[in-house]
Amino acid sequence: MLYSKKKEFVKFLEGIYKNANTIVAIHYHGLTVAQLTQIRKDLRVSGARLKIVKNTLAKIAVANLKVKQVDIFSGPIAIAYSEDYITVPKVILRFADQYPSLKVVGGFVDQKVATMNDIEQLASLATSESHKGNFLSLLQIPIRRFATVSHAPLVKLVTILKNYVNNKS
């Protein structure tokens, strides 16, 4: 890789560290190309990305940002990142259960070092979409109750008229 390309890649990684709220580093040795592609697709669907990184360049990018130095950059490493806190840990841990050769080695949350325990805790949280769905269903409860209450007299009237017609016959 040319020196100019390396500098460009370091700037790219610095941008990821600055802008992504959650970064999870994975050791992907032993995964097939198809498996990595599937992980990328699932991450992309949820608004996240996966990038294979060169360890020395990743270390330089982390050092430039004055983030606490971590020893997660050794061996074949990829980083999954997103602005959403929950998406990346959920997807990566689901694939880690599915593919034993995929190992989560650490990460960053809000530019602070995250342990495996931190990542597991984030993955256990509900997504923002489920929170939005719960909120919307709560908003619908009064509307449903109003519809039921306003509809009840009509149903009673129809029942009375039906009984009246049946008694006349």
Swiss-Prot record:
GO process annotations (BP): translation
GO molecular function: large ribosomal subunit rRNA binding; structural constituent of ribosome
Keywords of the record: Ribonucleoprotein, Ribosomal protein, RNA-binding, rRNA-binding
Pfam families from the UniProt entry: Ribosomal_L10 (PF00466)
Domain of life per record: Bacteria
UniProt entry tagged with the keyword Mitochondrion: no
SUPFAM superfamilies: Ribosomal protein L10-like
Keyword Ribosomal protein part of the UniProt annotation: yes
GO cellular component, one term: large ribosomal subunit
Recorded family membership: Belongs to the universal ribosomal protein uL10 family.
Function of the molecule: Forms part of the ribosomal stalk, playing a central role in the interaction of the ribosome with GTP-bound translation factors.
Subunit structure: Part of the ribosomal stalk of the 50S ribosomal subunit. The N-terminus interacts with L11 and the large rRNA to form the base of the stalk. The C-terminus forms an elongated spine to which L12 dimers bind in a sequential fashion forming a multimeric L10(L12)X complex.
NCBIfam families: PRK00099.1-1 (NF000955)
Name of the featured protein: Large ribosomal subunit protein uL10
